[in-house]
A protein has these predicted regions:
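Residue-level signal for secondary-structure boundary elements
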Residues: 82, 86, 122, 126-130, ...
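A conserved FAD-binding loop/helix module that cradles the flavin
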Residues: 167-191
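Active-site-proximal substrate-binding core of FAD-dependent oxidoreductases
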Residues: 74-77, 154, 186-195
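An anion/pyrophosphate-binding glycine-rich loop and adjacent beta-alpha core
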Residues: 1-100
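A glycine-rich dinucleotide-binding beta-alpha-beta segment and adjacent secondary-structure elements
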Residues: 97-170, 177
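Flexible, glycine-rich terminal cap/loop adjacent to redox cofactors
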Residues: 43-47, 166, 178
């Protein structure tokens, strides 16, 4: 797989993982997500989650400037030191990457959660915590930081059906498709009842 730049705002940085059809790249990739609750970022606005996301994206951009993506070997992440050179795994991010200490970029509780998760995954997937594994940040768009309110009929207001990732009801292609199917079934149900 590959990690690609998925930034959508000037001077903000976002990455995402992908694979070509054959899935025969030199690396495998996976996203390790950390649960972030409103209590982790809420100040006084429904947009505080978006502001928290943007703060991380801006901080990552500032570390790399000109879209250099922060990367770090897992052993260096664990030892809280900047990576000086890559090991047996080469980052695939384009256009360029920059060695950084992720511990200095993300909040401590996120770093602690990532380390705990990577070690836990290694108990099920041998080598997941390989010293030379490359961490690439930030993948901040795995789910929406806001959620549009809707009722049991999937309506936000008459004829407006907020569904899928952008509306905050799913976190990927499959869950978006499922949410869309559920919404379509509700619409069909209403049409059949003459509503």
């Amino acid at each position: 797989g590959y990690v690609v730049n998925a930034s959508s705002e000037n001077e903000h940085l976002v990455v995402n993982g992908m694979s070509n059809f054959a899935r025969d790249g030199i690396n495998a990739n996976s996203a390790v997500l950390v649960e972030i609750k409103p209590s982790d970022y809420y100040v006084n606005s429904p947009l505080d989650g978006l502001n928290f996301q943007r703060m991380i994206e801006k901080k990552c951009y500032n570390v790399g400037k000109d879209y250099g993506v922060p990367v770090q070997r897992y052993i260096d992440f664990k030892n809280n030191q900047i990576t000086k050179e890559i090991g047996k795994i080469t980052p695939t991010i384009k256009p360029r990457y920059i060695y950084a200490n992720i511990n200095d970029i993300l909040p401590k509780w996120i770093n602690d959660s990532l380390k705990e998760a990577i070690e836990a995954f290694s108990l099920k997937i041998n080598g997941f915590n390989c010293d030379d594994a490359i961490l690439t940040i930030p993948e901040t768009r795995s789910s929406s930081p806001i959620q549009i309110k809707r009722n049991e009929k999937y309506l936000a207001t008459k004829y407006i059906y907020p569904i899928g990732e952008g509306a905050g009801f799913s976190g990927g292609i499959m869950t978006s498709a499922i949410d869309g199917i559920k919404c379509a079934l509700k619409i069909i149900e209403e049409i059949n009842r003459g509503e």
